[in-house]
Swiss-Prot record:
Accessory component of the proton-transporting vacuolar (V)-ATPase protein pump involved in intracellular iron homeostasis. In aerobic conditions, required for intracellular iron homeostasis, thus triggering the activity of Fe(2+) prolyl hydroxylase (PHD) enzymes, and leading to HIF1A hydroxylation and subsequent proteasomal degradation. Necessary for endolysosomal acidification and lysosomal degradation. May be involved in Golgi homeostasis. It comes from the Eukaryota. It comes from Homo sapiens. This is Vacuolar ATPase assembly protein VMA22. It holds the Pfam family Vma22_CCDC115. Keywords: Coiled coil, Congenital disorder of glycosylation, Cytoplasmic vesicle, Disease variant, Endoplasmic reticulum, Endosome, Lysosome. GO terms for cellular component: COPI-coated vesicle; endoplasmic reticulum; endoplasmic reticulum-Golgi intermediate compartment; endosome; lysosome; membrane; vacuolar proton-transporting V-type ATPase complex.
């Protein structure tokens, strides 16, 4: 009876793996399309604005990421990746906010440190009125980042499923020598 349960579990795991592989291929196809679309839109923007107007010389001297990739442990030790906007988790300020010496005579305001809550949009590096194709390129690459994180999570789930499949096959081989 244990062999029948093991075979049923093996069958369900194989079906899950096949579904995950099909989903992985679909997401990879969409990712390739998004990246291709992004590069094509970037080429259109370079054509519209001029080759020298869209290039590395317009990049900011100090760049900050707009998104971060967070890895978290899900069920059964699987790692899941998630794309999170960079402004969501701001580091906390440590230390005194006020100056060391204060004048007691009058209420004077101490200047508050400037905090950039939202990171600057990189499209502003190329001017105020940028072509629509440059915005399309940014959106395509942003979608590609999300898809890449989903693909990495899915690939981890597939690897975990393959290791589970091998383990179940070994158990079945021990229960029924000559089968499997």
């Amino acid at each position: 009876m244990a062999a029948l349960d093991l075979r049923a579990e093996l069958d369900s795991l194989v079906l899950q793996l096949l579904g995950d592989l099909e989903e992985l291929e679909g997401k990879r196809t969409v990712l390739n399309a998004r990246v291709e679309e992004g590069w094509l839109s970037l080429a259109k923007a370079r054509y519209a604005m001029g080759a020298k107007s869209v290039g590395p010389l317009q990049y900011a001297s100090h760049m900050e990421p707009q998104v971060c990739l967070h890895a978290s442990e899900a069920q059964e030790g699987l790692q899941k990746f998630k794309v999170v906007r960079a402004g969501v988790h701001a580091p906390e300020e440590v230390g005194p906010r006020e100056a060391g010496l204060r004048r007691r005579k009058g209420p004077t305001k101490t200047p508050e440190p400037e905090s950039s809550e939202a990171p600057q949009d990189p499209l502003n590096w190329f001017g105020i009125l940028v072509p629509h194709s440059l915005r399309q390129a940014q959106a395509s690459f942003r979608d590609g980042l999300q898809l890449a994180a989903d693909i990495a999570s899915l690939q981890n789930r597939i690897d975990w499923g393959r290791s589970q499949l091998r383990g179940l096959q070994e158990k079945l081989k021990q229960l029924e020598p000559g089968a499997a």
